[in-house]
């Protein structure tokens, strides 16, 4: 118990630094941009528009209100992709600071994932615009959507801790992970419905082994379908999230003392 108390004291001791790092990341993303934070809303809208044009001929007849279906999945996947790729580079990117002074190393991937979450909240504005523009039916379940955001935030933290640590020792991981993310996007029902896949084995693999499926499906249940996720999706999302966080933190803590030798 005293160990956890000590760790919480250290966390609160550096909470101001965490806030500054998150604030810096959010400001730097759109620095010197004419539209600034408007891009957080405009960018997902433009991507949604392009993907709707490209995929609508294949899937729109089978999926009601395709733009809303698309942007609800894209919003979550983009958060995971952006946050974990940023977290992966966080230790190496702050190598000079780590060499000069003591700072809890976990604070860097934590800051990257958190700043991506802030950006995701801006992106939710784009989703609401699409919902309003298409006159989509919404229910009060929409108000529960932050629950799924918390789930995928925890999951992304776990992945971010793991990736940031392994990237210190294996720099090629950045390139490998980019390929993995691309394949992962197509293996997640973002722009297609699982009902459109006739191969039951493929559907089983996606549902059983794709953790992002749980968060995309849960988010769509609340926002798009207007219902609460089933027990498998809801509780599975929590289990996967904390399992990923536990593995990520365990590996990060195990190897963090060796970072200084490689950065």
Region locations from a protein language model:
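Hydrophobic transmembrane alpha-helices and immediately adjacent juxtamembrane helices
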Residues: 1-263
């Amino acid at each position: 118990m005293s160990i956890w108390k000590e760790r919480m004291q250290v966390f609160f001791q550096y909470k101001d630094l965490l806030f500054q790092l998150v604030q810096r990341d959010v400001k730097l993303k759109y620095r010197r941009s004419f539209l600034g934070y408007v891009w957080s809303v405009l960018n997902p809208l433009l991507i949604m528009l392009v993907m709707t044009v490209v995929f609508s001929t294949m899937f729109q007849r089978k999926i009601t209100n395709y733009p809303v279906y698309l942007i609800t999945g894209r919003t979550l996947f983009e958060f995971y992709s952006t946050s974990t790729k940023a977290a992966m580079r966080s230790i190496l990117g702050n190598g000079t600071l780590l060499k000069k002074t003591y700072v809890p190393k976990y604070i860097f991937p934590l800051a990257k994932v958190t700043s991506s979450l802030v950006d995701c909240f801006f992106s939710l504005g784009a989703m609401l615009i699409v919902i309003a523009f298409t006159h989509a039916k919404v229910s009060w379940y929409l108000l529960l959507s932050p629950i799924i955001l918390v789930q995928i935030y925890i999951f992304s933290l776990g992945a971010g801790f793991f990736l940031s640590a392994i990237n210190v020792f294996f720099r090629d991981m950045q390139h490998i992970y980019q390929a993995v993310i691309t394949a992962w996007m197509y293996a997640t029902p973002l722009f297609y419905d699982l009902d459109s896949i006739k191969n039951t084995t493929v559907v089983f693999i996606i549902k059983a082994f794709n953790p992002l499926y749980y968060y995309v499906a849960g988010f769509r249940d609340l926002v798009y379908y207007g219902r609460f996720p089933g027990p498998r999706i809801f509780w599975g999302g929590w289990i996967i999230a904390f399992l990923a966080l536990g593995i990520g933190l365990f590996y990060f803590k195990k190897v963090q003392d060796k970072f200084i030798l490689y950065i």
